[in-house]
Amino acid sequence: MSLIPRIFGDRRSTSVFDPFSIDVFDPFKELGFTVSNSGETSAFANTRIDWKETPEAHVFKADLPGLKKEEVKVEVEEDRVLQISGERNVEKEDKNDTWHRVERSSGKFMRRFRLPENAKMDQVKASMENGVLTVTVPKEEVNNPDVKSIEISG
């Protein structure tokens, strides 16, 4: 295991040409510099989400430490789009408080994914446990066509 961080991502990085990703292209994302629509540069605004496909479903996982399920929205839109969003508010400051360090992220995030044709959009389920959001989108069963062998004469 390397102690040097990978600058250009890892084997699971999303391809720029991924037909299912509809996030806004950010050329500085892999270098650790980000540009956010809201002007925020927090890590929270750039929440990373894993998407894996199993034989039965598409499964999305997001680490959202410190968020309650009421602060997270999972929505499905027309045209097979899954949208995951949330907001963590900035802690209220008291004039008598002296801050020595502020490292926790706050702000909003929103990620959108276009799902393939086999997604059952009417059966999406979401759960949140220990700060990990899991969204499961079942897949349609694929009917394997009957294959008939043809005898070759000659």
Curated annotation (Swiss-Prot):
Its main location: cytoplasm. CDD domains: ACD_ScHsp26_like. Keywords: Cytoplasm, Stress response. It is found in: Cytoplasm. SUPFAM superfamilies: HSP20-like chaperones. It comes from the Eukaryota. One of its GO terms (cellular component) is cytoplasm. The keyword Cytoplasm applies. Induction: By heat stress. The keyword Cytoplasm applies. Belongs to the small heat shock protein (HSP20) family. Forms oligomeric structures. PANTHER family: HEAT-SHOCK PROTEIN 20 FAMILY MEMBER. This is 17.6 kDa class I heat shock protein. It comes from Solanum peruvianum (Peruvian tomato).
